[in-house]
Structure formats: structure tokens, C-alpha cells
Amino acid sequence: MSRKRTSPNRNVQIADQIQRDLSELIMREVKDPRIGIVTIQSVELTPDYAHAKVYFTALTGDPEKTQEALNHASGHLHNLLFKRLHIHTVPTLHFHYDQTIEKAVEMSRLIKEANSTRAKDDDEADTPAKDD
């Protein structure tokens, strides 16, 4: 007898549904003052749906305190998800601050700085030296 395998597409669909539901639940159900305005960026599920890495950004507040508060509320959020999702296993939630935006801004700054240094060096090379 063969076991029924879940398709990778199903994993993505469930992760997307968890992302949508968590966004709503955090906004409406979690009353922790350490959690400001939070955006759930993505959810990564393990193949057996036992664990989910939830990546978020915080528009307001300290990201570390927000992460701590979200992980503290993860049990409550897990129970609320269990009532909404119609799947056998609702994953244990692990919240992680998504630093992608900060890294992109820093990378852009470094590129801009490198380009301006390069342009300055090119200008100095093109300018003839003055004879004293």
C-alpha cells in the first residue's frame, strides 16, 4: 500500500494561508503592547507541517522585543490557527525578524558609496596635474 504524498504546491498553499491568518490574528487577537504594527512577510513550513518559520517586519517598536512577544504569544496563535485551518497538523510557530529590507538598504548605500568614490577617482585621473 502506497502512502499518499503531499505536493510541494500544497505546502505553499498552506504556508500562504497561515501567513494570511496570522496577519489577521495578530492584528485582532494579540493585545501585547510590545507588538506594534507587524507585517508577516513569509512562512516556511517543514514538509511534515510540524514547524513553521514565520518571518515578520515591524513598522513600529523594537524588533527584538516584538519577536520575543510574538514567540510568547505563539501558543495562543497556534490554538487560534487550529480553529481556522482544516489540516491534521497545525505547525509550531517560530517567529523571526526579517532583515531583508535593512540589508537591501545597506547594500544600496554601499553601492552608491562605491560609485561615488569611483566617479571621484575618475575625475581626479582626468584632471591634469598643475605645474608649480
From Swiss-Prot:
Matching InterPro entries: KH_dom-like_a/b, RbfA, RbfA_dom_sf
Transmembrane segments: none
Single GO MF descriptor: ribosomal small subunit binding
GO cellular component: cytosol
Keyword Cytoplasm: yes
Region (Disordered), start-end ranges: 113-132
Compartment(s) where it occurs, according to its Swiss-Prot or TrEMBL record: Cytoplasm
Gene Ontology BP terms: maturation of SSU-rRNA
UniProt keyword annotations, A-Z: Cytoplasm, Ribosome biogenesis
Principal location: cytoplasm
Xref: SUPFAM superfamilies: Ribosome-binding factor A, RbfA
Family matches, as HAMAP family: RbfA
Function statement: One of several proteins that assist in the late maturation steps of the functional core of the 30S ribosomal subunit. Associates with free 30S ribosomal subunits (but not with 30S subunits that are part of 70S ribosomes or polysomes). Required for efficient processing of 16S rRNA. May interact with the 5'-terminal helix region of 16S rRNA.
Family affiliation: Belongs to the RbfA family.
Subunit and partners: Monomer. Binds 30S ribosomal subunits, but not 50S ribosomal subunits or 70S ribosomes.
NCBIfam families recorded: rbfA
Name of protein: Ribosome-binding factor A
